[in-house]
A protein has these predicted regions:
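Flexible, glycine-rich phosphate/dinucleotide-binding loops
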Residues: 31, 62, 183
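Short, flexible, glycine/charge-rich loop motifs used to bind or transfer phosphoryl groups or to couple energy/partner
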Residues: 11-13, 44, 164
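Short hydrophobic/aromatic-rich motifs at helix boundaries and adjacent loops
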Residues: 11-14, 66-68, 82, 100-104, ...
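Structural alpha/beta surface segment adjacent to cysteine/selenocysteine redox centers
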Residues: 35-120
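Alpha-helix initiation/capping motif
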Residues: 2, 7, 30, 60, ...
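A short beta-strand-turn-helix
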Residues: 2-20
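C-terminal cap of thioredoxin/glutaredoxin-like
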Residues: 17-26, 40-41, 120, 124-228
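Short, thiol/selenol-centered motifs that function as redox-active sites or metal-ligating centers
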Residues: 27-37
Length: 228
């Protein structure tokens, strides 16, 4: 189905009948990702639509470079790059591990981690991780057992596969689908604000005709097609 063939689909007049799935691909220790999460939650609080939100940890060579440049770090320093990569990977595994004790605790873990890093300006360390576990009330023994398990690593790899299927190349990236057309979605790489998300959701089918398809990197807004 071509994008032009979707123009006859009209949004339901009842906003409550529309359900949106928002996939925000994040670096758990990235400040820019933290701000985008706040914008997504702001949108959810004020929208009349039903929204399912998914925070998905994702990183690759390019996203690590992006993180280092955003933080004015020397991305040519191999030792520093490896250190940053390890921290992002460990934080991602820790978030996936916390989710095994419930979605609510998983979200609380992510929020507390980002509060400690970006508001209290602490470094990501094993000591900070243990402190966060205690603050939000995770089962500590279970946490460390789960984190070392094959299951958590498999769940993490699934997230990387989802990112690849949705053509995500950087973070933060937000992919939006709705229940009226689950084959096509819109991906945002820039200007991820509550206002922009609201605009996309209100005009999703119109935007599917207007936005270009994902054909190359660094497109700020484009359409992706999911193959099921």
């Amino acid at each position: 189905m071509k994008n032009s063939e979707l123009s006859h689909i009209q949004p339901s007049p009842l906003s409550t009948e529309r359900i949106f799935d928002c996939y925000l691909f994040i670096n758990p220790i990235g400040k820019q990702c933290y701000h985008c999460e706040q914008e997504v939650m702001k949108f959810i609080e004020r929208t009349p639509y039903k929204v399912h939100v998914h925070f998905i940890p994702f990183h690759n060579f390019k996203s690590v470079t992006q993180y280092m440049k955003n933080n004015h770090l020397n991305d040519k320093n191999i030792d520093l790059r490896n250190e940053i990569y390890t921290k992002i990977y460990d934080a991602s595994l820790s978030y996936k591990t916390a989710l095994l004790q419930g979605k609510k605790l998983g979200r609380a873990f992510l929020m507390e981690l980002q509060t400690q890093l970006h508001l209290l300006h602490k470094e990501y360390t094993p000591e900070l991780l243990q402190e966060i576990i205690q603050i939000i009330g995770l089962d500590e023994k279970m946490f460390y057992e789960d984190k070392a398990s094959k299951l958590v690593h498999q769940e993490y790899e699934k997230d990387q596969q989802i990112a690849q299927e949705m053509m995500v190349e950087m973070n933060p990236s937000l992919v939006i689908f709705d229940n009226l057309n689950q084959q096509y979605g819109v991906i945002l790489h820039q200007n991820i604000t509550a206002e922009m998300i609201e605009h996309v959701c209100d005009n999703l089918h119109h935007d599917l005709d207007k936005c270009p398809k994902k054909t190359h990197r660094h497109q700020s807004c484009c359409v992706i097609q999911m193959v099921h």
